[in-house]
């Protein structure tokens, strides 16, 4: 089985059926609700960063440098990571996909600002995006599993293109900087995932939300799994 572990904010660690360890949008060392720091992360094969903001990207650089993991993300973001000492990157752009040892990864549209933390000259500004993964099945698995990490985003009509193609959706509900609970529920209508795990909420007061109220709002549209930092979901 694959396992998703929530580390707070938009950071998830994904252990795949085939033995790869991935981490989405690391934000650990300065995250007030994270259960671990970057020094606590062990084996890591890939770091996936949806955009360059301080709460999604700089810890990814730390982890890639220490573990030797490959960073995956938008072209300009990965080019900046290389200037910071990251040796292995895979540059992509929105709408493009690539087959990795863990499966197929595609960058999906997101509507969010794209400045890069640490890029004081502003030379590496890029598009924010999400990730859609079609994971390779492991031994004894009935089939691959499809994971959608939306990144920070507003509600997008393009999400309808994912309908019926997502097993587990990781969606922000915090409002203020991203879509809130109402728009996230509409996103679920668009995507029709089997399971939804809310993210990007309760890190700071401006994005405080009651996840149980979100569960009630979503109702029968999908199974909502609320994870506290450090908790995991297997699928």
Q: What are the functions of these language-model segments?
A:
Residues 1-3, 15-22, 97-106, 135-147, ...:
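Beta-strand-turn-beta hairpins that frame and shape the catalytic cleft
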Residues 70, 82-97, 185, 189-235:
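Binuclear metal-ion centers of metallo-dependent hydrolases, dominated by the metallo-beta-lactamase
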Residues 13-53, 58-65, 113-125, 153-164:
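Pre-active-site segment of Zn-dependent metallo-hydrolases
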Residues 58-124:
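Glycine/small-residue-rich loop that forms an oxyanion/phosphate-binding "nest" at active or ligand-binding sites
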Residues 23-26, 44-52, 72-75, 147-151, ...:
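Active-site neighborhood of phospho(di)ester-bond hydrolases with catalytic His/Asp-centered motifs
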